Amino acid sequence: MVVQHNQPGSTDQSVIRNFCIIAHIDHGKSTVADRILQLSGIVPEREMRDRFLDRMDIEQERGITIKSQAVRVPWTFDGTEYTLGMIDTPGHVDFTYEVSRALAACEGAVLLVDATQGIEAQTLSNLYMAIDHDLAIIPVLNKIDLPSAEPDKHAEEIAGLIGCEPSDVLRVSGKTGEGVADLLDQIVMDVPAPHGDPDAPARALIFDSVYDSYRGIVTYIRMEDGELHDREKVHMMGIGMTHDPIEIGVISPDMTRTKALGAGEVGYIITGAKDVSQSKVGDTLTSAVRPAAEPLPGYRDPKPMVYAGLFPIDNAQFPELRDALDKLKLNDAALIYTPETSVALGFGFRCGFLGLLHMEIVNERLSREFGLDLIQTAPNVTYDVTAEDGSQHHVTNPSEFPDGKIKKIVEPMVAADIITPKEFIGAVMDLCQDHRGIMGTMEYISTDRVEMHYRIPLAEIVFDFFDQLKSRTKGYASLDYHEDGEQSADLVKVDILIQGEKVDAFSAIVHRDKAYSYGVMMTKKLRSLIPRQQFEIPIQAAIGSRIIARENIRALRKDVLAKCYGGDITRKRKLLEKQKAGKKRMKMLGHVEVPQEAFIAALSTGEDSNDRDTKDKIRAAQKTEG
């Protein structure tokens, strides 16, 4: 293993280079990071594995990066040893907040582009973020070893975008390691050194934190000014708390304890605190002995885009769910949650997420890391509803939707940027129109690829828009979106009634044009999931008091005539009349239990409206409306 001569706390700022790797999902960030770790020699050959910095099981299995990782890497250039602070960032649109925090801890960014795919939507969004942070940008084409790579064509695309020469675009292969040494040399030459004041009082920005069940909260920091020493009391300027740190150190590539951290360095500090509220991302850390006067500018708090209810299948697990969310919140600053109660599902939490993948990952982490079995309600967005009497309602859950006449409903909008090959322009336009999109501008970024700009309601994107976009463009299109104001819309609340009683978990707020198809889909789904009873059960979809769709679960027939052998018809009729009266009474008093499996299956986002019968019903209704 390589010996590092630049020791944390005594490294001159002029030899420090902090950079992050940004790219669209699947363009090879983590693979290039692996090669950098290997080349620098800080990871012994026998310990090396693919996606070394993706520490979570989910990251390894799905092949995606969810958490940014900050590593200290030594690199010798022209006889001088430099210290590189490398941050590997996520690529998916849901984790843009992780990327923006990583950018604030760097002076440079390596913009990685797949030489087989070219520029994609997330490449552009990450590039614009890096430009906003005034970072030095190093453009790099990855995967040049693949036979389908077109480096010359894509180098021109990048040059046109950034305003450099095509020859300035570096070419590397994360798989074979070709060109990675040149990339590290370029980082040393192009990325500016940090410019903090080493003699000023210590100031460090908290850019991430994780929870360790043995040592409590591990806080990742970027030192801006001054230095922090081991065992020196630290003060959190935002929340006003003082701690005695247990340990201070750097990640290289595992946690390594050090005596100090100096200006410009990226490292970690363990305060020993177990309370998750005691380490806020974006807060400023300073020395309690010689505190700084002004905190550093923090981050914009992330704003949740999608809300869903999370309920434990076993209600006794509610306290465990609260603890699990508290711990997860520490790793995931973008997650927000408040307790809520549902008549059908009991106690749970209303959670806010950045997007559908974020929601899926949180769900999976809760079940894996904390062993919880959960039911999740259908995702929805926030609406501002004005009732007829002028009262305002902020609705994050269909059950909060006011009854009675509605004057106005305002829904959030997003600006969507879609990059697609030109032969799929028609398919993308159809899809966006079906989802109430408004066409903006369209420009060619190369001879055969187009960037299209649409304004689409967020509610239309959160369900299955991305999957449909991929299937209609054979997987070639990419999507990036950001919030873009709001607009009033003709929305209604569709309630599902089982035996005349509303089941709050199945209610949804949808556009009036799609209310019927949602009603048909949900009633059909429930008909196949709820077990039959001795009496007939109606399942209805309603807007207010108007029923728009209905399915019946047929009654089980008990043969009361089985014990009659031949004989008098009046005897049989008497038995049948008695059964009829019993069923009538049962129907009036009977309570239909919806089994847990039915909730889980009905609320799963996999749409069941693909069968021919449902489609025919919807089509017929649309014709009569037209």
Curated annotation (Swiss-Prot):
GO molecular function, one term: ribosome binding
Gene Ontology biological process terms from the UniProt entry: positive regulation of translation
Topology of the protein relative to the lipid bilayer: Peripheral membrane protein
Catalytic activity: GTP + H2O = GDP + phosphate + H(+)
EC code(s) of this entry: 3.6.5.n1
Gene Ontology cellular-component terms listed: plasma membrane
UniProt cross-references to InterPro entries, sorted A to Z: EF-4, EFG_III/V, EFG_V-like, EFTu-like_2, G_TR_CS, LepA_C_sf, LepA_CTD, LepA_IV
Enzyme class: hydrolase
Entry keyword annotation includes GTP-binding: yes
Disulfide bonds: none
Physiological role: Required for accurate and efficient protein synthesis under certain stress conditions. May act as a fidelity factor of the translation reaction, by catalyzing a one-codon backward translocation of tRNAs on improperly translocated ribosomes. Back-translocation proceeds from a post-translocation (POST) complex to a pre-translocation (PRE) complex, thus giving elongation factor G a second chance to translocate the tRNAs correctly. Binds to ribosomes in a GTP-dependent manner.
Subcellular location: Cell membrane
Region (Disordered): 603-626
Gene name tied to this protein: lepA
Listed name of the protein: Elongation factor 4
Domain tr-type G: 14-195
Keyword tRNA-binding: no
